[in-house]
Amino acid sequence: MAIQHPDIQPAVNHSVQVAIAGAGPVGLMMANYLGQMGIDVLVVEKLDKLIDYPRAIGIDDEALRTMQSVGLVDNVLPHTTPWHAMRFLTPKGRCFADIQPMTDEFGWPRRNAFIQPQVDAVMLEGLSRFPNVRCLFSRELEAFSQQDDEVTVHLKTAEGQREIVKAQWLVACDGGASFVRRTLNVPFEGKTAPNQWIVVDIANDPLSTPHIYLCCDPVRPYVSAALPHAVRRFEFMVMPGETEEQLREPQNMRKLLSKVLPNPDNVELIRQRVYTHNARLAQRFRIDRVLLAGDAAHIMPVWQGQGYNSGMRDAFNLAWKLALVIQGKARDALLDTYQQERRDHAKAMIDLSVTAGNVLAPPKRWQGTLRDGVSWLLNYLPPVKRYFLEMRFKPMPQYYGGALVREGEAKHSPVGKMFIQPKVTLENGDVTLLDNAIGANFAVIGWGCNPLWGMSDEQIQQWRALGTRFIQVVPEVQIHTAQDNHDGVLRVGDTQGRLRSWFAQHNASLVVMRPDRFVAATAIPQTLGKTLNKLASVMTLTRPDADVSVEKVA
């Protein structure tokens, strides 16, 4: 697959607000989000083009919502297969775990297959929308140094020329072997799996069966995955004593493929590559003016398809905070909440991925026998079966501290969780997803009420300066009731009834939603003012809070 990139003019002794090391998916997403916020960004990439072979193959609903936030989801969807099930098979082919979630609470299918190089190309092309963003290929990051108010980055071109970039912030998205992380001596704690796997990608899918299958064969476990555009991926465990060179030999490749294909000679190989599965987590995500994201901060086995998606969560969490700090709307202490919020969830996804790998290829033979026996019980325990079928075991991001205000018991609070994204009806009759009505902004969303009623004039001014949208949700049949309109408030109809159900479940009538779509706080009209003051404080917003009481009585 040939990936094109635009002609790039060199930047010599250039000054930008943010330098991003690495033009992988996390770096490209960071650049797109910051670009639409008007931030001057320079992306530098060691390679001469985007990687053009498939790597990650799973993109989830949260990542698609992130793509939506930068206006690229419509271009990404043609390179995905939605509702992609994952099935674990015994050595005899019996399905003992069928992971097939059909929920779309965040607006998109939960599990999707995709072709990463084509989606990366969409993100790279997306940068062309922003004159304030540039991407330089064939630039090796040789050194960097931090000062009180900037980072100096030293680059080397393919021709050996040196360039210097001065940036307010450096975001390291330079992969698991991150030069930036290693230079800063940040511990990368974890382990490397003893077994390797060989990945074989084939064009014109010779099986064409949908979904992904993980066969728990004790002799040689393997994976068979259907990907978009008629690509088939097989993954086989590399056994002790085998080498990549040996497995790539035609007779050995034929032997591998004969396990899964009736005619292993009639295939169109795209590539074969051996991977080692690592499970590692950086001790720190922020070091003064340097921030680590994606694989530079955490790497995990592929079995739950969460390495790519965890990187997208990093980008979404960090980008809006970095934009606020650069724009002078928040102090840089806000950036400390990035590690506070993201590190624990990244660890949870690492642990889940390791567990899934142990189910596929248990370290001990007896563990595989136990797994196969226990799997029969799933058929007789419907609640447990639904737990796997609906992917409820996936640790959903939930932040217990950071840029949020929590009231009451944390276990049942929606604060720190991603807000739902149902369809809503606009006053002109159009039906759209909620985020499309809000844009890349904060939102104060009220069920049935005027969200401005509980705010002081000073607070309204402060939150409008952040670009906040004020949303009044009403039953769809009330959307054209003119007397309910309020200046500066967008009214939307609850097309599917999901917003009413959400507010009823959580005993709140107002939600403060962050730009990354997480619930920062909940309130009722009489307590909204006090809640916003607390939130402004924990987010270190630069405008002083109004020293007035804004609680109201009816």
Swiss-Prot record:
Taxonomy, superkingdom: Bacteria
Pathway stated in the Swiss-Prot or TrEMBL entry: Aromatic compound metabolism; 3-phenylpropanoate degradation
Enzyme Commission number, as recorded: 1.14.13.127
Cofactor(s) this protein cannot do without: FAD
Catalytic activity: 3-(3-hydroxyphenyl)propanoate + NADH + O2 + H(+) = 3-(2,3-dihydroxyphenyl)propanoate + NAD(+) + H2O; (2E)-3-(3-hydroxyphenyl)prop-2-enoate + NADH + O2 + H(+) = (2E)-3-(2,3-dihydroxyphenyl)prop-2-enoate + NAD(+) + H2O
GO molecular function, one term: 3-(3-hydroxyphenyl)propionate hydroxylase activity
Keyword Flavoprotein: yes
InterPro entries xrefs: 3-HPP/3HCI_hydroxylase, FAD-bd, FAD/NAD-bd_sf, PheA/TfdB_FAD_monoxygenase
Keywords annotated in UniProt: Aromatic hydrocarbons catabolism, FAD, Flavoprotein, NAD, Oxidoreductase
Annotated residues for binding of FAD: 17-46, 285-295
Family: Belongs to the PheA/TfdB FAD monooxygenase family.
Function: Catalyzes the insertion of one atom of molecular oxygen into position 2 of the phenyl ring of 3-(3-hydroxyphenyl)propionate (3-HPP) and hydroxycinnamic acid (3HCI).
Protein name: 3-(3-hydroxy-phenyl)propionate/3-hydroxycinnamic acid hydroxylase
Gene: mhpA
